Every structure is written in structure tokens, then in C-alpha cells.
Amino acid sequence: MLMRTWIPLVILVVVIVGGFTVHRIRGFFGSENRPSYSDTNLENSKPFNPKHLTYEIFGPPGTVADISYFDVNSEPQRVDGAVLPWSLHITTNDAAVMGNIVAQGNSDSIGCRITVDGKVRAERVSNEVNAYTYCLVKSA
């Protein structure tokens, strides 16, 4: 009878010892109660200084342009048939803002400019037939 029962007994002992070992390891590692660093109290948070972003498209007087830009939420917006010079002022309290503007006009010259808090961060002028230009500020 011992000849047939020794294998199940060894398996039972191995399972018991393995279970005990796993129980001890789980009790030793990861058992501490770590403090939570997240806090839902937003009342004391100070807003960032507002950022003032200005998009400008310029060219010869009377130029008509199609303009695409990112708004304050980085959503694409489009203005068709804008008479130049054209500008848009955006104010946000976000920590960072991305500025992107693209324009194509019906004249041989067109330019764009992005200013952040009064400082020119991107400027470009294009001189070609049906001129196309873009300006990009990755982080402001």
C-alpha cells in the first residue's frame, strides 16, 4: 500500500510547503500600508498665471486667406476667407499651451506670427504664388 500512496503524499507535502511559502512571502513583501499621495482638495491650489497667446496672419492689404489654428483646448479651428491682417487673442490658465497656425492666401506674400505673453515665439514669411505659411509653438 505504501508503494501506491507515496507519490500523492509527496505531491500533498509539496503543495502545502509551497502554499505556506507563498503565504509568508506575501505577508512579508507588500504588506505595509503605504500612504496615499493623491489629494482631492483643490480649494487651496493656486491657478497658474494666465498665458496670453496671440495668432497673427499678415500680408499685402486686401489679401484673403484661409486659416487653420488650434484653440485653447488644442482643438482645430478654421476661418475661411479672412481679410488680412487677421489676429486672434487667446487667454488660458493652463500650465502649458501649444500654438499652431496655418494659412494660405491669394497673394504672393503671407506671414504668420505667434506671440506668448508679448514675446514673439514663432514668425515666418512666405513669398510665392498663392503663398502658404505656418507657425508652431510646441510649448508655451
UniProtKB/Swiss-Prot annotation:
GO terms for cellular component: plasma membrane. Its main location: membrane. Disruption phenotype: Deletion mutant does not exhibit a low iron growth phenotype, but has attenuated virulence compared to the wild-type strain. Deletion of both mmpS4 and mmpS5 drastically decreases synthesis and secretion of siderophores, and greatly reduces virulence in mice. It is found in: Cell inner membrane. It is a single-pass membrane protein. It comes from the Bacteria. Induction: Transcriptionally regulated by MmpR5. Repressed by iron and IdeR. The keyword Ligase does not apply. InterPro entries: MmpS, MmpS_C. The chain crosses the membrane at residues 2-22. Keywords: Cell inner membrane, Cell membrane, Membrane, Transmembrane, Transmembrane helix, Virulence. Gene3D superfamilies: MmpS1-5, C-terminal soluble domain. Interacts with MmpL4. Can also interact with MmpL5. Part of an export system, which is required for biosynthesis and secretion of siderophores. Essential for virulence. Belongs to the MmpS family. This is Siderophore export accessory protein MmpS4. It comes from Mycobacterium tuberculosis (strain ATCC 25618 / H37Rv). The lineage of its organism: Bacteria, Bacillati, Actinomycetota, Actinomycetes, Mycobacteriales.
